[in-house]
Regions:
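Solvent-exposed loop segments that connect transmembrane elements
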Residues: 25-33, 70-85, 127-157, 194-206, ...
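Structural signature of Gram-negative outer-membrane beta-barrels, strongest in the C-terminal barrel
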Residues: 47-53, 61, 173-175, 183-185, ...
Length: 533
């Protein structure tokens, strides 16, 4: 909704609310919304233009997510039935503010300032063994209560609460083809994790940590027309990060008595350089070619798991050098673009898993490490064809090959394992889609989209893979003067496809390692009505 407040002041309000029951039936709790998604978002923008040289934009956002978390089952069933005895939670509340000011000091000289602040509270909680004692007794003949009253509560609900405050400030100046700027970020995060009766992560019952991250960066960009058809653009960025981490936790000894674990502190500094140089050639008004060489980076950090060794806690920045070429063409009947790329990853970051205690599912944890070098290469193609004045066809194809060099990590306390020497995790080799869009003069429209994703490794620390799958989405609707009504179907073929996969021991009494799957949403049918006023 747009509202004019004063002569030079306008306000825009946006609000969104989404609800879904999460497509899970919890048999143990006899409820249908244990995995619900209830999300509300609002945004207010206030623009003020006192004169032709100064513009100010203030923004306020509010987001509240009251989501459940119940996505896993100890039988890996595809019927979306779960057996957890405790309610999971994946909630978030965020307040955010930003102020952007642009001042035209003189012709071809602009100064821009962007300030922002956000504060977020997050809660993540889940049932540690994913089921109640009745399930394990009936399905596996295993009854925790036979082991004594102190044993079963060990695998109770895990809960992690975070408070995150983030302040950023950016100032940049543009003078013709030159841009100079500076950037500052200060992130503070406090984590409180606890378990009602027992093991938390790797054997801790309570954890408390403070994470203080500061980033300071300067950047520059220069663009020049070498010829009327050939343009050169180059940019450079230098960034320095400072990380201070303090963590404390309480664990259990052999007699299940709480003991204080040794506190952990880190004070780390990292410096990183990024750059990009590109050439853009305009062949004619329909066709252009480009090529670029660039280096990007990903900041380092500290793992907060209390039972990791000191050597495994910090991880270094990753640097990636990219080479890319491509073309774009926009003709009357079609639009197409193609790009091919090759990337070298140095000191690459990988997410590995570790189960500190074979007989404790809550001791399964993820942490980030560095894996030496690796490569990424492939191509992407997108095309839109105007079949007729009412019908067009969209198609896309992606091909990706990756490689991670061999690396070592700790799979359990004192147990070193080897990973890598294969493709990277979460990197399907082939992806693609084909879609049709129809709309006539009377406002009737329809679309069909079929997408495909190839198999991929779930993690860098085990060799379990997903299955390839295809999804079909359909829409049918009609537009009126101010109203649009749409009937839609997502995952029309009701495909069961996995989105995440973990590999660890969960089932007593022997706790063999198994692949545990989480599935994407089933078929959904709905109606959407849009009204413009």
């Amino acid at each position: 909704m747009n509202v004019r407040l004063l002569k030079n002041m306008n306000m825009r309000l946006t609000g969104i609310y989404n609800y879904s029951d999460g497509f899970r039936e919890n048999v143990s709790q006899n409820i249908m919304d244990s995995n619900k998604r209830e999300e509300a978002f609002s945004r207010m923008k206030l623009s003020y233009n006192p004169n032709n040289r100064l513009s100010i934009l203030a923004t306020r956002i509010y987001a509240e997510l009251k989501n459940g978390y119940d996505a896993w089952a100890p039988d890996n069933n595809t019927d979306f039935k779960t057996f957890s005895k405790d309610k999971g939670e994946d909630s978030q509340r965020t307040f955010g503010y930003s102020l952007r000011a642009n001042f035209e000091a003189r012709e071809n000289l602009n100064i821009t300032s962007i300030s922002s602040f956000t504060e977020t509270d997050l809660v993540h909680a889940y049932d540690g063994d994913w089921a109640d004692s009745a399930y394990y007794s009936k399905i596996h003949g295993w009854n925790y209560t036979n082991l004594g009253e102190d044993y079963y509560p060990i695998y109770s609900v895990h809960r992690n609460e975070k408070n995150r405050a983030n302040l950023t400030q950016e100032v940049r100046m543009s003078a013709g083809p030159i841009i100079l700027g500076g950037y500052y970020k200060h992130l503070k995060e406090q984590d409180i994790a606890f378990d009602n009766n027992g093991w938390l992560i790797g054997g801790a019952t309570d954890g408390n940590s403070h994470y203080n991250f500061q980033a300071t960066a300067g950047y520059a960009q220069y663009g020049v027309d070498l010829t009327p058809s050939l343009k050169l653009k180059a940019n450079f960025r230098y960034e320095k990060n400072s990380i201070i981490y303090d963590g404390s936790s309480i664990g259990l000894n052999d007699y299940l008595e709480k003991i204080f674990l040794a506190p952990i502190s880190f004070d780390i500094d990292h410096a990183m350089i990024g750059y990009r140089t590109s050439l853009h050639y305009l062949k004619d008004k329909f066709t252009s070619f480009y090529g670029s060489v660039s280096q990007g980076y990903k900041s380092g950090g500290v793992n907060q798991q209390p039972f990791l060794s000191d050597a495994s806690r910090p991880y270094e920045p990753e640097f990636i050098r990219n080479f890319e070429i491509g073309l774009k063409r926009a003709a009357h009947k079609y639009r197409t673009q193609f790009s091919a790329f090759y990337s070298q990853r140095n000191n690459q970051q990988v997410s590995v898993s570790s189960q500190q205690d074979k007989e404790n599912p809550n001791s399964f944890l993820f942490y980030t490490g560095n894996a030496g070098s690796g490569t990424i290469q492939g191509f992407e193609w997108e095309n839109t064809l105007n079949v007729s004045s009412n019908l067009n066809m969209d198609a896309s194809l992606g091909y990706l090959t990756t490689w991670v060099d061999k690396f070592t990590y700790f799979a359990a306390e004192g147990v070193e394992a080897i990973g890598g020497d294969r493709e990277a995790a979460m990197s399907p080799k082939m992806t693609g889609s084909v879609g049709f869009n129809y709309e006539n003069e009377s406002g009737i429209f329809a679309s069909a989209l079929m997408s495909f994703k190839d198999e991929y490794y779930f993690s860098d620390s085990h060799d379990q893979q997903s299955e390839p799958y295809s999804l079909l989405s359909l829409t049918l609707g009609k537009s009126f003067r101010k109203t649009t009504a749409t009937i839609w179907i997502r995952n029309a073929m009701d495909e069961r496809y996995t989105t995440r996969g973990f590999y660890f021991g969960l089932i007593p009494p022997d706790y063999p390692d198994q692949l545990w799957k989480s599935y994407g949403d089933p078929r959904q049918i709905g109606v959407t009505i849009d009204y413009t006023f």
